[in-house]
Amino acid sequence: MENNNEKFNVSVVLPIKSSNVIGFDDYFKKCIDSIKNQRVGINELVIVHTDETNLVEFLDSYDFESINVKRYVWTEEPSFALQVNHGVEKCESDWVSIFEIDDEYSNIWFKNVKKYVESYPEVNGFLPLVIDVDERGVFAGFTNEATFALNISSEMGYLNNETLHTYQNFQISGMVLRKEIFLDYGKIKPSFKLTFGYEFFLRLTYNSVKIMTIPKIGYKHTNMRTGGIFWNYKNGEDVLTENEVKFWIESAKKEYFFTSERDIKYQSQEV
């Protein structure tokens, strides 16, 4: 384990729906190892998981070593948004970061965030440059890099509302955000399918929350993992039609003015 006596006051929130997915054990080990190997340690890992028997037994027996782990059992219908929201509410740190079981932090991520927090105290959120890979680990692209594109971002390195109306490919997982900002501006809206992260970013930037991308690789994301939330929207039990995809994108652009959840439901746009 990395010698990380130095710590950053951040809670990592990890929602888990089920362990009955392909490659779960391997994914989980890699994601937890990426926390163990941080150059600067975290304050706590908050896991919000369902009461699935196999999952509970797996977590009960897992060796997290010196990571400060807090677990909360989610007994309602599984929901990425609601489980994340609950986890953030339980956090005991000034900063929070949303994590996924099929993802990994780079070992310098929280070290870099700590340095940037000290240098840019007016900034409330920090995005990593994300490497996207497929299930085989093959490079598929980058995410969050558009804040450095001159034709997309008007303020180099910063995410703003104007940029989001031009370009949507930004990711909330891996991001480090002040806990009070997450809670004060309404958390993640659970009624949103597909575009919950996009709407969240629109809402934050509309309310003048300053978000910066740190220009270093900070996160690796497994794109379209079989059984994952976005895979289900395309291939699984929650498949969205093209019209539904358009609806959720347009709804995000309309609903970010409202801090509170308004329980949006799909309405066909066909005439």
Give each language-model segment a name.
Residues 96:
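Short aromatic/hydrophobic "clamp" motif used to bind/position activated sugar donors
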Residues 43-52, 72-75:
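Short beta-strand/loop segment that forms part of the nucleotide-sugar
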Residues 30-42:
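Short, acidic, metal-binding catalytic loop of nucleotide-sugar glycosyltransferases
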Residues 145-167:
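Short, flexible, basic/aromatic active-site loop/helix in glycosyltransferases
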Residues 108-144:
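Conserved donor NDP-sugar-binding/catalytic core segment of glycosyltransferases
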Residues 74-91:
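Glycine-rich, basic loop-to-helix element that forms the pyrophosphate-binding segment
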Residues 193-200:
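Acidic donor-binding loop at a coil-to-helix junction in glycosyltransferase catalytic cores
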Residues 78, 138-144, 191-193, 206-247:
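Nucleotide-sugar-dependent glycosyltransferase catalytic core
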